[in-house]
Design a protein with these regions (language model features):
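Ordered alpha/beta subdomains of enzyme catalytic regions
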Residues: 1-148
Length: 152
């Protein structure tokens, strides 16, 4: 399924977990949002007992980066979240940052259809640390899901 098949492709930003968003706010608050960041995607064990997997999902990655936006509804939802100690979980200035968020990262990936093996990098993302943080969960979900399905 291409990301363009999703009825609302801008909703991709919320295909994450709260950890990624709170870490992004921490990077933003500490002034480290634009420091160089990098993460790699790999799998630990052979999916479904096979000796290898077939890389899938890399064709979707540029679209993922391009469509990573926070809708007004996303911002309203995030603004409604309460911190465990009380008060707003996300600062209004950080939510303003997310309103205009655009990712500018570099992605290096094993080509679509190539064999991949456990503990070997399949994808490497480099760029501003906050942008990498917000892309991590969605990217891992796409690549690892497609690749594990191809191994089945």
């Amino acid at each position: 399924m291409a990301l363009t098949d999703i009825s609302h492709p801008t909703d991709i930003a919320m295909l994450t977990d709260l950890y990624e968003l709170t870490m992004a706010q921490g990077l933003w608050e500490s002034g480290k949002a634009n420091e160089q960041g990098c993460f790699t995607a790999f799998y630990r064990d052979h999916p479904f007992g096979s000796a290898y997997a077939v890389m899938c999902g890399t064709a979707e990655l540029p679209e993922l980066v391009e469509n990573l936006r926070f809708t007004p509804e996303d911002i309203d939802y995030l603004a409604s979240l309460q911190a465990p100690a009380g008060g707003a979980m996300f600062k209004p200035a950080f939510l303003d940052y997310l309103r205009n968020f655009r990712a500018h990262v570099n992605i290096d990936a094993v080509p679509e259809g190539e064999l991949v093996f456990p503990r070997e990098p399949m994808v490497r993302v480099t760029g501003p640390s906050l942008e990498c943080q917000l892309l991590e969960t969605a990217l891992l979900n796409i690549c690892l899901l497609y690749t594990s399905d191809a191994a089945d």
